[in-house]
Amino acid sequence: MARKTPLHMVRNIGIAAHIDAGKTTTSERILFFTGISHKIGETHEGTATMDWMDQEKERGITITSAATTCFWRDHQINLIDTPGHVDFTIEVERSMRVLDGAVAVFCSVGGVQPQSETVWRQANKYHVPRIAFVNKMDRVGANFYNVEKQIKDRLKANPVPLQIPIGAEDNFKGVVDLIQMKALVWESDEPTNYVVKDIPADLQDKAKEYHDKLVEAVAETDEKLMEKFFDGVELSIDEIKKGIKTATLSLNIVPMLCGTAFKNKGVQPLLDAVVDYLPAPDEVPNIKGQYENGKEVSVESTDDGEFAALGFKIATDPFVGQLTFVRVYRGVLASGSYVYNAGKGKKERVGRILRMHSNKREEIKELYAGEIGAVVGLKDTLTGDTLASEKDPVILERMEFPDPVISVAVEPKTKADQEKMGIALQKLAQEDPSFRVATDEESGQTIISGMGELHLEIIVDRMLREFKVEAEVGKPQVAYRETIRKTVEQEYKYAKQSGGRGQYGHVFLRLEPMEPGGENYEFVNDIKGGAVPKEYIPAVDKGCQEAMQSGVLAGYPVVDIKVTLFDGSYHEVDSSEMAFKLAASMGFKEGARKANAVILEPMMKVEVETPEEYMGDVIGDLNKRRGQVNNMSDRGGNKIIDAFCPLAEMFGYSTDLRSQTQGRATYSMEFDHYDEVPRNVSEEIIKKRNG
């Protein structure tokens, strides 16, 4: 079967936004207008097609990125839904990897919010071209021009409106198309087509001003157009459109559109913009890959050539079991064929291939380069794994996933559920690389770790819904770390003589603090003249790493240390790897005790938005939680407080904030960095840990 949609007519796009900007509604309307979902699902009634997990229906926030295919003007649009809640940043990061372009949705009232900044940074990191859609133009306080200014000031981007709104709030009727210089008017709130009219008299000056800005922004991308512009020659519609696309793909501009998805206004022009200005898979830089031996290679988007794809999401589907969402970068994936998991060195058989239309599924025989689908039947493939052909086992860029910052102990309500809980947690950990499961060696408890309270709540919730396991959850535990503050040198001799062959290892170690944020550990071999034979050096390194797993103060993992082995001695008969490993491990612990060891705690970046009258209470409360306020600003009549707060003090914050502000304040919180714990707090932590 040949491909139905040529590569240049494929668009892989994500819709990224902050919670409540109306992302799900926008996705819904896109699916509606492209003719897939006939009844429009509303998020507030809990029936949106994109939000297909039960909890999303209850919480009204989008958690898992479902990939959905729809068609507009004969183009195939693969829509990847990205979550907007900060505990799920990992999901956003994961979907950014496989997108070619994005639609950033902003609320016309709320504008650029902290989560928008996080998502924007991720899109910059992966060089994703984007267009902005200012949604909810029908709401009280809607202001398109404010959002334009915030995109400039806060996101440091270059927004270029392709439309300006006609009216706002209840009087929002449509938009002025600044390319064709016509008014597009929707005459009712029902999902209908717009009517093209002349620009209303009171908007003609503003439209002219913004049209000129648009043309100038476009002209800057091309010398020929620049000459025309300076000679006062009008650019043709085609020239303007081509210029917008060039400038969008080079990330020089962010085209801005507006509308209200809820009232069905502005969605068709948004779809046109996706087709006209966002890139096809062959218009973005080739993805890089490498081979086992480290040799780099560029993987071109084409149906010819050996198969290469990235598994970017694992989901458990109640009907077909485990689904692996893949994006094909090169070649063709056929159902029933074998693929090679290059990173793991394993062959896997592809069962069925499904194309998802929200929550309906269509079985297809093949997926071509640039396309996205879900594969049934892969056993060993995890998020971020490359699938390739055995002839050309390329590994595409790995995704990097952050370490969890919060843990809780979970126990099944009944003994009978113990095994079921183990299976459930293992499956959930396969789906989500930022979620970890471990067993506490001392207590035997099962410990789950993740990126925030909401993240873990949802995991426990899913265990109950999908796997019917009821779990008791312990108090949240913070992922503390330990490090040292001064450089020390430490000698350690491990010598045991117990009849027959003895044990002998002797090392001199230098422990130095390293700058945080880089590698956690560095080992330097500085042995001169064979004082410690070469074959024992790796054992010394290993001994230090083992000692770092449990620090000297309270047994937390040790970070940011450089260890240099600079001298030692050995015994012809009694020395062994074991002896040197033990000498290094014990020497490391003794050295760490003298090196001003301190405890580090995760600091969260907290942003609170509150009505002014509660500002004093909110700041007072943050100070009580050992927070440091960095900045205060205004947004839409409210006060914004930016602060760093220790995660340990932030449990249950949402409830406290609600009661302080009568439910009128909102906040967002994400992990930022590790910082030293004050002495009095550190003493308490040590006392608690060492009982």
Curated annotation (Swiss-Prot):
Molecular functions (GO terms): GTP binding; GTPase activity; translation elongation factor activity
Cellular component terms (Gene Ontology): cytoplasm
Compartment(s): Cytoplasm
PROSITE patterns linked: G_TR_1, G_TR_2
Keywords associated with the record: Cytoplasm, Elongation factor, GTP-binding, Nucleotide-binding, Protein biosynthesis
CDD domains: EF-G, EFG_III, EFG_mtEFG1_IV, EFG_mtEFG_C, EFG_mtEFG_II
Binding sites annotated in the UniProt record for GTP: 17-24, 81-85, 135-138
Pfam family for this entry, one: EFG_IV
Keyword Phosphoprotein among UniProt keywords: no
GO process terms (BP): ribosome disassembly
Domain tr-type G: 8-282
Chief localization: cytoplasm
Top-rank taxon: Bacteria
Family: Belongs to the TRAFAC class translation factor GTPase superfamily. Classic translation factor GTPase family. EF-G/EF-2 subfamily.
Function (record text): Catalyzes the GTP-dependent ribosomal translocation step during translation elongation. During this step, the ribosome changes from the pre-translocational (PRE) to the post-translocational (POST) state as the newly formed A-site-bound peptidyl-tRNA and P-site-bound deacylated tRNA move to the P and E sites, respectively. Catalyzes the coordinated movement of the two tRNA molecules, the mRNA and conformational changes in the ribosome.
The protein's name in its UniProt record: Elongation factor G
